Amino acid sequence: MSELAEKECVPCKGGVPPLKGEELERLARQLPGWEVVDEHHLRRSFRFRNFREALDFVNRVGELAEEQNHHPDICFGWGRAEITVFTHKIDGLTESDFVFAAKVDRL
């Protein structure tokens, strides 16, 4: 499991550049199953046996988001959920996005 999950999400104050290049790739290697899309956001799809399992998972992600004060975009339906993570304030990726994704993997 990634050591990223041991960290905490840090609120972004803005004015920092989004992660790019080697640093982005280094962090992405620690999150198998997550896709880096256009160097802008992280995305992962999850499958479940039914609607209730998907809903329970989404609720746990929501609780994590509130605890970490880092809020993903969530899309879900019968037997599936998709989580998209990026830092809205800078419209790109920060280390906190990778931390959050690693924490989602622990749910």
Curated annotation (Swiss-Prot):
CDD domains: PCD_DCoH_subfamily_a. The keyword Transcription regulation does not apply. It is an enzyme of class 4 (lyase). InterPro entries: PCD_sf, Pterin-4-alpha-carb_dehyd, Pterin_deHydtase. Keywords: Lyase. Its EC number is 4.2.1.96. PANTHER family: PTERIN-4-ALPHA-CARBINOLAMINE DEHYDRATASE-RELATED. This is Putative pterin-4-alpha-carbinolamine dehydratase. The lineage of its organism: Bacteria, Bacillati, Actinomycetota, Rubrobacteria, Rubrobacterales.
